[in-house]
Amino acid sequence: RGQVFVQGLFQMHADGTGQTEFYGNNSWFPTALLHARGIPKSQEVVAVFSGHHTLQVGKLGIINPARGRQENQGARLIAPVRETAAERIDAYGQEGELFAYPYPLSAAEFLVSYTPDGWAVDPAFFKLYWFHADGRRELLASDPDISCHQAIPLVPRATPPERQSTLDPTQHTGGFALQDGYAGP
């Protein structure tokens, strides 16, 4: 595969075992998934759909691997929710409004850095918003001199469940399994 379309999401257990694809390992779309965070009480993640050779901004979307793990099968743009075509564009998501650093509060509500003007203003100037998946939004914070990025609520969040490690720390070798070297696009 080429150097451009290799920006899928991987997952693993806390002890480093079980490394596997979460989404898009054999996909051209989305080109890159940035700032991905798990949505509480679901198997979905919210992320910025972007390009490879771009800045770390793009379109706001949700990845649901239960609907599929390649191309646009489990990927949908939100704010507002809409059909999401699988586009092969290196600089994906760089036109119009721009999103960065989403933080899920629920399956439908997010804190996110956002600029409605996109690159029309240079440099792009981000403000902190509350967003609903349907596109409703409310400005929470802005600064006349700097962009607002990486919002994190100052309240406790439930600790995700962690499976017990199966590693034996006395061992110095391990095993590797390749399921099917011929599978893929």
Predicted regions and their residues:
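Blade-level signature of beta-propeller repeat domains, shared across WD40, Kelch, NHL, RCC1
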Residues: P123-D168
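Conserved beta-propeller blade repeats
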Residues: R1, S27-E44, R88-L105, E109, ...
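Structural motif
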Residues: V4-Q11, T54-N64, N72, A120-Y129
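Surface beta-strand/loop "capping" patches
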Residues: A86, D90, E97, P156-P185
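Residue position within the beta-strands of beta-propeller blades
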Residues: R1, E44-V48, F110-Y114, P160-R163
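Residue-level signature of beta-propeller blades and closely related beta-rich strand-turn architectures
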Residues: R1, F49-H52, A66, P116-D117, ...
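Surface-exposed loop and turn segments in beta-propeller and other repeat-based domains
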Residues: Q19-F29, R69-G93, P144-A158
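Short loop/turn segments immediately following beta-strands, especially the blade-tip
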Residues: H13-G16, I62-I78, L139
